[in-house]
């Protein structure tokens, strides 16, 4: 990765992360915290935006297909905003490529394994921290 690409990802990721922080907090304060609505809104909106950007790139090319657009918007901004958007785009691309089984596996396995990984990490720390001495 070039220095220019790294800077684009860095700046985009910074902006995306700040956007996620503010939108998620705003939604949580407005709707309530009984469900993670802030994260939900960020994930769905990020998935919509990355799908829109990918569609524009596929139909219009030009600026939507440039390295700058890809690294700043797709990887940096949307990656900082929500990584679920990348996961969703990859799943849709598998479907569009006729790889429905791989898409389904990606969706189910990612969701299941990520939840299990969080539980394992959390449980592991709880267990280690309870260790005497």
UniProtKB/Swiss-Prot annotation:
Primary location class: membrane
A cellular component term, taken from the record's GO annotations: plasma membrane
Record's keyword annotation contains Ion transport: yes
GO biological process: cellular detoxification of fluoride
Classification via InterPro entries: FluC
Superkingdom of source: Bacteria
Compartments (UniProt record): Cell inner membrane
GO molecular function, one term: metal ion binding
Catalytic activity: fluoride(in) = fluoride(out)
Protein keywords: Cell inner membrane, Cell membrane, Ion channel, Ion transport, Membrane, Metal-binding, Sodium, Transmembrane, Transmembrane helix, Transport
Statement: the UniProt record of this protein carries the keyword Signal: no
Regulation: Na(+) is not transported, but it plays an essential structural role and its presence is essential for fluoride channel function.
Membrane topology recorded in Swiss-Prot or TrEMBL: Multi-pass membrane protein
Entry's transmembrane regions: 7-27, 37-57, 60-80, 107-127
Binding sites annotated in the UniProt record for Na(+): 79, 82
Function comment: Fluoride-specific ion channel. Important for reducing fluoride concentration in the cell, thus reducing its toxicity.
Family: Belongs to the fluoride channel Fluc/FEX (TC 1.A.43) family.
Full protein name: Fluoride-specific ion channel FluC 3
Lineage: Bacteria, Pseudomonadati, Pseudomonadota, Alphaproteobacteria, Hyphomicrobiales
